[in-house]
Amino acid sequence: MEDAGEDPTTFAAHSLPSDPRLLATVTNAYLGTRVFHDTLHVSGVYNGAGGDTHRAMLPSPLNVRLEAPAGMGEQLTETFALDTNTGSFLHTLEGPRFRASQCIYAHRTLPHVLAFRVSIARLAPGSGPITLLLRSAFSPESPDLDLHQGPDFQGARYLYGHTLTPEQPGGPQQEVHMLWTPAPPDLTLGEGEEARTWDFLTAVGGSQAEAQACLTEALQLQARGALYTAHAQAWAQLWVECGLDVVGPLQLRQALRGSLYYLLSALPQPKAPGYICHGLSPGGLSNGSREECYWGHVFWDQDLWMFPSILMFHPEAARAILEYRIRTLDGALENAQNLGYQGAKFAWESADSGLEVCPEDIYGVQEVHVNGAVVLAFELYYHTTQDLQLFREAGGWDVVRAVAEFWCSRVEWSPREEKYHLRGVMSPDEYHSGVNNSVYTNVLVQNSLRFAAALAQDLGLPIPSQWLAVADKIKVPFDVEQNFHPEFDGYEPGEVVKQADVVLLGYPVPFSLSPDVRRKNLEIYEAVTSPQGPAMTWSMFAVGWMELKDAVRARGLLDRSFANMAEPFKVWTENADGSGAVNFLTGMGGFLQAVVFGCTGFRVTRAGVTFDPVCLSGISRVSVSGIFYQGNKLNFSFSEDSVTVEVTARAGPWAPHLEAELWPSQSRLSLLPGHKVSFPRSAGRIQMSPPKLPGSSSSEFPGRTFSDVRDPLQSPLWVTLGSSSPTESLTVDPASE
């Protein structure tokens, strides 16, 4: 979808931003750095005790800059570009005689490998040598690691050591082992040579053997001339399998592409074996050193702001994120015990252990709404995948149950109101602390408890009576006279709030609201939300107005929702003035949701994925490809007049067949694999087709969820459909059904 011939996938400039925090990042699921930065980080490697724990700084061999020697006597054009198609950062110098380029990347299929390559090509006749400089400031030192130099391995230097201070007393001091091929001070295209390329590798592991094995694998690919090709092809395949685009303004398209690129960069390649998630922090793996981007800690940002879009495009990574919460459950149980409560209280700021590592106690004690965000992520995952194995055998049920137990021990009964109260909390609006009955938090309590009860029933487990009693009787503040939800007991309209809070009710938090109340909540809080608040706020106001079909207000807020994106590499800052966390995945996640869930109207429910597309001015078409739902991959696109849905792949014969139920006609259209189905734009739901009648031919398993037959995410056997012949299209007028 090209707009006026512009490419929304490559972000180029002739100079770098003056603020080095805004340089592009290159990351994969294990390693991350900013280009031309002296530090790299390793996933899950933290140094420092308690609230001082932060991502350990490892010196980066990629901190090398290509330069022309002084006095070369040529006018050179310098270009810097982030190519999202290949997950690569390119620095190019071009003159009349030559073109030299440096390509920096975090390898997509070898996550323990970072690399850069330098190429020099002759452009004009002549045979003289051409020499370029490589400026490096590498120093084998770190304030966080006790590092030592070891023997070279296959031409690579070796640096190893361990963190200085464990997160908790007696905890592990994590090992880091790094091998790298050092860059020389200059490179020369020899006399008579037309072109040449040099590769420089960095391999990092948790042991010497792991680092050596990873470097060896990379060197083998390099010897075959396939090192960069394997990386670029993996990115190309990823973009084939998932995508998000609009026919609309270039800046919006670039914002969508950049946000999805940075989020996908934090995740493993689909079907990658052995991936262990150590959580996603607001600034990503490229940031998080001491006193930087919240020290690399994991917040509710992961579960509420990043997770929903990840789930739709990459359910394996979504499961790995939930496994991080399962793995840190012991820490959450201890957090609750330390506060005098039962069950689990997930840390407001979490690192390796799951114990609270927030430097300021007030947030760890009061922002209990993180628990609700964690359980909501488990709920969305369950409805999307029906992966009962995660809950039956892999610890998911333990998390959901422990949070339910925490809520029941944390609430207090009010005889006067005959309601359960939740006192002394802080909601997302951090301008107000120690409040009673945050409406956002209390609705999350309801949601957590009701999901816990429903899941217990599906698992054949007893349901404690207190769970539904608290869910039904917890106070949900509502002002009948003014027809809106006060943020908490005693909130007065007009009080300034920090960020989206009450407006999260309805989406992303499931909660039934009349259109009038939804509108009033939006109007009241939009007027008093601080313009200095974090980036994800305005995307949720945009979603709210999309729900109400107010396209004008929604479009203005959608544009405002990516105003924190900095040029030229589309790196986000937490706050509009450029302060706060950078490469702010939280803000990107909120913005992506504004399109993936706002424009489409997608809502993941127990019955299916509902849709209700809305067209905004200046956007004539929205396309979302590679959506996952119960073992099926779908493409969903719409314009002013029509909606098109196509099932493009199935994970196996156990994946249920789907249909689209249109509203209000109740027409049901079969979504046959390999066929496009188009219908006039309307609301509806994508859902499982009813089981075949007895005796009919079917590959489905009537009466059983597909997770009963096979774990849907363990080595899925994706079958791509329609690749050998043109995809058939079926256009349906529901009125004729």
Swiss-Prot record:
Effect of residue 429 to N: Significantly impairs catalytic activity
Residues forming the catalytic site: 430
Residues covered by region (Disordered): 681-737
Chemical reaction(s) catalysed: (5R)-5-O-[alpha-D-glucosyl-(1->2)-beta-D-galactosyl]-5-hydroxy-L-lysyl-[collagen] + H2O = (5R)-5-O-(beta-D-galactosyl)-5-hydroxy-L-lysyl-[collagen] + D-glucose
EC numbers for this chain: 3.2.1.107
Entry-linked Gene3D superfamilies: 1.50.10.10, Maltose phosphorylase, domain 3
Gene Ontology cellular-component terms listed: cytosol
Enzyme class: hydrolase
A GO term for molecular function: protein-glucosylgalactosylhydroxylysine glucosidase activity
Superkingdom of origin: Eukaryota
Binding site for substrate: 300-301, 498-499
GO biological process, one term: carbohydrate metabolic process
Keywords: Glycosidase, Hydrolase
Compositionally biased region (Polar residues): 721-730
Task of the protein: Catalyzes the hydrolysis of glucose from the disaccharide unit linked to hydroxylysine residues of collagen and collagen-like proteins.
Family note: Belongs to the glycosyl hydrolase 65 family.
Name under which the protein is recorded: Protein-glucosylgalactosylhydroxylysine glucosidase
